[in-house]
């Protein structure tokens, strides 16, 4: 099945910034959180904040182990390109489920990474205290 997608800043498609970026998010239902290089435990580009914060169903490579923070009712983990394709096609056909998971993911993201939690984490790290986010 065909998947409509845009990859900005890739293969001669200019990157988009500012309002154009947020307009593209607003016109999207799902987002792929790709990071440069090989997947690394808990590493993600800041793109995840834009995707999840704007309520998009977000797909993340399982090798990042972000499923330690988010469950399958909040983010969609994929194992490889074929798995990703199957999952995108599934959620394309299951809009209510897509919306529920995206909404739960947005809520969880804001719970984990709000300004108070981040400030406390930075202060605890700076003062040599045990620091955790989740």
Language-model features, listed with the residues they occupy:
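Nucleotide-sugar donor-binding catalytic core of glycosyltransferases
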Residues: 1-73, 77, 129
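Short acidic active-site motifs
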Residues: 20, 83-86
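Short, flexible helix/strand-to-coil boundary loops that buttress conserved ligand/catalytic motifs
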Residues: 70, 88, 102
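Conserved acidic donor-binding segment of nucleotide-sugar-dependent glycosyltransferases
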Residues: 75-81, 91-95
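Catalytic phosphate/metal-binding cores of nucleic-acid and nucleotide-processing enzymes, i.e., regions
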Residues: 81-84, 105
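A charged, aromatic-enriched C-terminal amphipathic alpha-helix characteristic of glycosyltransferases
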Residues: 92-125
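C-terminal accessory extensions appended to soluble enzyme cores
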Residues: 124-134
